[in-house]
Amino acid sequence: MHTPVLLKEMLEILDPQDGKIYVDATFGAGGYTKAILNAANCKVCAIDQDKHTSIFYEELANNFPNRIHFFINKFSQIKQVLLGAQLERVDGVVFDIGVSSMQLDDANRGFSFSKNGPLDMRMSTSNSIDASVFVNTVSEEEIANIIYQYGGEKYSRKIAKAIINFRKKKVIETTGELASIVRSVVSRSKNHDINPATRTFQAIRIWVNKELQELEQGIMCAADLLNPGGKIIVVSFHSLEDRIVKMIFKSLCSDEISLKLNTGFQLINKKIVRPSFEEILNNPRSRSAKLRAILKI
């Protein structure tokens, strides 16, 4: 079961109001959407590129008739999606970035190093390139660079060399094979909290799904869609994502961007909002979550 992270904090900042329209740009299992719909007599446009999430939409649509619209698409396409639904402005957009618990827990999706399955990692099956294409065709130098840049893995060159050596013998087809390759050259950390394959899997997933480009484009499009008083809330899970969110928010708050967009933005929370100790105890996957928010003025 997917447990929404920083749900209470997100709701307090968004402060849903009757008659307003909000966007859940990363619908998933619908946790944020359900909470927003329960908080006020408002409407939610829910977006997710993963077609497997439609089952959760159907359940919410029955419970909240005529108050939720669902679109299978990437959130970088948020502007086109809303214009297609004849919506030009909204009052808030929430992003919960990264892979969901549902995707991690399904071995067939190929996201998890702890469950053996096909090496896929695509959030949308419409993408033609999956993780197996990456590890079996990309050069050693590029593999090393991606794992270092997107995963912060200091052993990226050793891992890349091990991948190349393995694929000379056979095609790398499963998550189990890739995890084993990484473990062959990287030992478990002293605190035992981080699996040796964590950073490599993260980096490849980000590359496959173009997650950082999607994030930047999605936030900028969302900023252009907000009514005055509208908010953008982003929950991210690793430092690379958070740096991008921080950079974009800082840019949106600058005078130069305000003049270009003919509007202004201000930070809602100058300090990062993090999960409480209690939330981390109840949901260990929340431990690295960071929330940032911005207001259109």
Curated annotation (Swiss-Prot):
Keywords from the UniProt entry: Cytoplasm, Methyltransferase, rRNA processing, S-adenosyl-L-methionine, Transferase
GO biological process, one term: rRNA base methylation
Catalytic activity: cytidine(1402) in 16S rRNA + S-adenosyl-L-methionine = N(4)-methylcytidine(1402) in 16S rRNA + S-adenosyl-L-homocysteine + H(+)
Residues the record lists as binding S-adenosyl-L-methionine: 30-32, 48, 75, 96, 103
Organism superkingdom: Bacteria
Listed HAMAP family: 16SrRNA_methyltr_H
PANTHER family attached to this UniProt entry: 12S RRNA N4-METHYLCYTIDINE METHYLTRANSFERASE, S-ADENOSYL-METHYLTRANSFERASE MRAW
Protein name: Ribosomal RNA small subunit methyltransferase H
